[in-house]
Every structure is written in structure tokens, then in C-alpha cells.
Amino acid sequence: MRIRLFLFFMLCADISWSQTFKVDVRMIEVYATVSDSRGRAMTNLHSDDFHVLEDNRLQQIRVFEPQSSAMTIALLVDTTGSMAADLPRVKNAVARLLDAVKPEDNVGLFTFANGLNRLSNFSTDRNTTLKAIFKARAAGQTALFDSVAQLSRQISKDGGKKAILLFTDGDDNSSVLSLEASVKSVQRTGVPIYTVLYGSALKDQRLSQRLEKISVLTGGIPFKVKDAGGVASAFARVGEDMQNMYLLGYQSDSDNQDDWRSIKVTLPNHPKL
């Protein structure tokens, strides 16, 4: 059995270590995906199947959203000048992704160049999002780090399962925040970021490592794709991964004023998995 957890960390059920992370509120949300030894997603789990431990103390789960619950998905598309040649294929891939998400999922479309722009509000109306993406134009410099930090803060204000899907060539030439500061800002919100690296940036190890760091440290998955077909496949994999999320929320019982906690999630009712 394997459990993948994220606010901005990953834990496996078959190893004994855990990572610490920083929180600013007493109600803490933990996202988890659970798979068996063959890598298949475990479905139909309930809140009493999970145990959440903070600093080795069992916590009461107060919020539970199963795999079937709706998600808030923010599509963040790089529309800077460097993406001009690839943007038409990105638009087509986004259209295919919209076919893969569940009808009840709320999807919003954002772009960034010199700053963050909202092209469509969160909605279950896919036609609105489709019309918005095909109006996007490539121009301007790249404020990648600022944009992901700003968007994660915006969508973290609402409850429920949420994620950012970032499509970019990985460059940044106009952000105020550094990569490290941006990642820390996103970590505080608990929003996972899935990154898709495409085009000429695949040949740049520095850009590849940058996007991998953004994804892994926020609980998402990094993807590298070589063509439009690969883009669509990556988007489909992201949609599947997000649909397999469980959301666990608990009220911390700690009186410790230190914001750093160690969290572990187990499935005691399934010892043979």
C-alpha cells in the first residue's frame, strides 16, 4: 500500500519517516491519494479508515471529502512571448483536459505574462472556459514565481479540494519573488501545483529542475512532454490524479506556538494492503 499526502509533502505507508511543514491556522487540511501494491487507486474509503497523527498524537478528522467530491481546478497558462509558437497546441490540449474533468468540478482559467490575469471565473460551464482559452494571446515578459504564489493565495480562501495546473516553459524574468520564496508562499496555502514543461525548455536542465521543484514541494506532479499528444496525455493523468484525492481536515490540539508540525496518515483498518 502506498499513501501520497500533500500540503507540501509526501509520505509512504511502508516507510517510517515523516516531514514537517509550516501552517498558519489551527484547522489543517491534508490531501491524500492512496494506491495498492500494484499502483491502483483505492476507492470507496471512508473517514474512519484514516488515522491522522500530528507529532505522534491522534487527531479527530472533522472534514472529509471522498474521491467523488467536486474539485476546484485552476488552469494557469503561460502566455508570454516565449510561448508564442507553442500556445496553439496548448489551447487544444486544454480543450481535451476539459473533457476529462468531472462535470461537477469547478474550473477557472488564468494566464500570466508580466502578471496574473483571470480569463474565466470558476464554473462548471466548460463552454465559457473554452471560449476564454482560445482568446489568449502570447506577449510580454514572464512573472512565473509571482503568479503561482498569487493564484494559490486566491484559491486557498475557499474550502474543499483544489489544485493548480501550470503550463509553462519554466522561464522567469520579471518576478519580485525568488523561486524559494514563491514555493514557501504556495506551501503555506496547501494548494498542490502540477507542472507541464513543454517545447524548447525540455533541453534546459535548469528550467526542468525548477518546475520539478515547484511540483514536488507543493504536492503535485511534474510532467515533461515533447508534443501535443504528450500534452494531452499529461493533462489526462493530472485529471485522474486529482479525481483520486481524499481531503482530510482536522483541528489541531497542539498548544505549541511553534507553527512547525509533523503529520502522518495511516490506514489501520487495512493492515494487509
Regions found by a protein language model. Give the residues of each.
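Sec-dependent signal peptide recognition
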Residues: 2-8
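Scaffold/interface architecture of coatomer-like assemblies
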Residues: 17-273
